[in-house]
């Protein structure tokens, strides 16, 4: 059953009326309602606020990492474990082919349904998840295979066990190692990009965001609680923090914005997945002109420009 956000109520009503008309076999009503649905969808999605985009980034029907992997990879083979502690299911790693090209995909997976969400810790990786990601990325470097990172997490898991096993060290190690990785790397924020938990697999030659995704150093609710002692002011915090793809592109913090279907990725997964796949293939083709040492040097130059300012 489809889930609807508060600003999608009119769309929900038309969807329900359309479903009833189809059941009754009322072709005339179906035509009218389909036109109404298209108009209402354009009206709602044409001028989304930052907070509404945040809601879309968290939408439960939005395609997750495994949805993209299963759709774009052929001959996919999953790679497990960090070879030190355990296999963290919040991070998934696959080797396969995209458009006939070898690729390794590393993604954060939130899970669907109660059991799967608990199994994957709601997409909040433990340190062993980040170590698994780094192990697989280093494997890709060894065989000169491009790496695609799919970022989608509310943040790294802040539990006691995770801290005892070196959560901050694991994130820092990934930032250090991925910055100098000698192979093509592409990172795409497909939903939530939550702070260090996202950065740990977000260092790449190309950093892109899906149109309705977000990337921030803290959740808007957390920001509102700290600054105003009022989590209910999260809408104002979202706007002030500039967390959307368009804002981050304007600030030069990401390279590209991947367009989503008018109604959002959650209502048209097939085209959203196609857009991401097309972007990845184009990015690989563009980056193949550089040798691996040039890639690492250019990536480092880009990183050192972040945060630079002049008065």
Curated annotation (Swiss-Prot):
<keyword id="KW-0276">Fatty acid metabolism</keyword>
<dbReference type="GO" id="GO:2001295">
    <property type="term" value="P:malonyl-CoA biosynthetic process"/>
</dbReference>
<keyword id="KW-0547">Nucleotide-binding</keyword>
<keyword id="KW-0963">Cytoplasm</keyword>
<comment type="pathway">
    <text>Lipid metabolism; malonyl-CoA biosynthesis; malonyl-CoA from acetyl-CoA: step 1/1.</text>
</comment>
<feature type="domain" description="CoA carboxyltransferase C-terminal">
    <location>
        <begin position="36"/>
        <end position="286"/>
    </location>
</feature>
<dbReference type="GO" id="GO:0016743">
    <property type="term" value="F:carboxyl- or carbamoyltransferase activity"/>
</dbReference>
<dbReference type="GO" id="GO:0003989">
    <property type="term" value="F:acetyl-CoA carboxylase activity"/>
</dbReference>
<dbReference type="GO" id="GO:0005524">
    <property type="term" value="F:ATP binding"/>
</dbReference>
<protein>
    <recommendedName>
        <fullName>Acetyl-coenzyme A carboxylase carboxyl transferase subunit alpha</fullName>
        <ecNumber>2.1.3.15</ecNumber>
    </recommendedName>
</protein>
<comment type="subunit">
    <text>Acetyl-CoA carboxylase is a heterohexamer composed of biotin carboxyl carrier protein (AccB), biotin carboxylase (AccC) and two subunits each of ACCase subunit alpha (AccA) and ACCase subunit beta (AccD).</text>
</comment>
<keyword id="KW-0067">ATP-binding</keyword>
<keyword id="KW-0443">Lipid metabolism</keyword>
<keyword id="KW-0275">Fatty acid biosynthesis</keyword>
<dbReference type="InterPro" id="IPR011763">
    <property type="entry name" value="COA_CT_C"/>
</dbReference>
<comment type="function">
    <text>Component of the acetyl coenzyme A carboxylase (ACC) complex. First, biotin carboxylase catalyzes the carboxylation of biotin on its carrier protein (BCCP) and then the CO(2) group is transferred by the carboxyltransferase to acetyl-CoA to form malonyl-CoA.</text>
</comment>
<dbReference type="GO" id="GO:0006633">
    <property type="term" value="P:fatty acid biosynthetic process"/>
</dbReference>
<dbReference type="InterPro" id="IPR029045">
    <property type="entry name" value="ClpP/crotonase-like_dom_sf"/>
</dbReference>
<dbReference type="GO" id="GO:0009317">
    <property type="term" value="C:acetyl-CoA carboxylase complex"/>
</dbReference>
<dbReference type="Pfam" id="PF03255">
    <property type="entry name" value="ACCA"/>
</dbReference>
<comment type="similarity">
    <text>Belongs to the AccA family.</text>
</comment>
<keyword id="KW-0808">Transferase</keyword>
<dbReference type="InterPro" id="IPR001095">
    <property type="entry name" value="Acetyl_CoA_COase_a_su"/>
</dbReference>
<keyword id="KW-0444">Lipid biosynthesis</keyword>
């Amino acid at each position: 059953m489809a889930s609807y956000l508060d600003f999608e109520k009119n769309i929900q009503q038309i969807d329900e009326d359309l479903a009833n008309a189809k059941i009754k076999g009322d072709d005339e009503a179906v035509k009218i309602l389909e036109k109404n649905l298209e108009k209402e969808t354009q009206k709602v999605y044409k001028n989304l606020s930052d907070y509404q985009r945040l809601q879309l980034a968290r939408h439960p029907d939005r395609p997750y990492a495994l949805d993209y992997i299963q759709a774009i990879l052929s001959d996919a083979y999953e790679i497990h474990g960090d070879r030190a502690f355990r296999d963290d299911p919040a991070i998934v790693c696959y080797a396969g082919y995209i458009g006939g090209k070898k690729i390794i995909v590393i993604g954060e997976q939130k899970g669907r349904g109660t059991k799967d969400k608990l199994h994957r810790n709601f997409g909040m990786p433990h340190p062993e998840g980040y170590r698994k990601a780094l192990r697989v990325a280093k494997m890709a470097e060894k065989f000169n295979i491009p790496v695609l990172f799919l970022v989608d997490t509310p943040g790294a898991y802040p539990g006691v066990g995770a801290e005892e096993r070196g959560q901050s060290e694991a994130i820092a190690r990934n930032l250090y190692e991925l910055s100098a990785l000698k192979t093509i790397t592409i990172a795409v924020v497909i939903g939530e990009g939550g702070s260090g938990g996202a950065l740990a697999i977000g260092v790449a030659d190309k950093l892109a965001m899906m149109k309705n995704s977000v990337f921030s150093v803290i959740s808007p609710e957390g920001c509102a609680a700290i600054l105003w002692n009022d989590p209910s002011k999260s809408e104002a915090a979202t706007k002030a923090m500039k967390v959307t793809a368009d804002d981050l592109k304007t600030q030069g913090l990401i390279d590209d914005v991947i367009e989503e279907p008018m109604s959002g990725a959650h209502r048209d997964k097939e085209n959203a997945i196609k857009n991401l796949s097309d972007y990845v293939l184009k990015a690989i083709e563009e980056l193949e002109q550089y040798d691996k040492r040039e890639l690492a040097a250019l990536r480092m130059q880009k990183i050192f420009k972040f945060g630079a300012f002049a008065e």
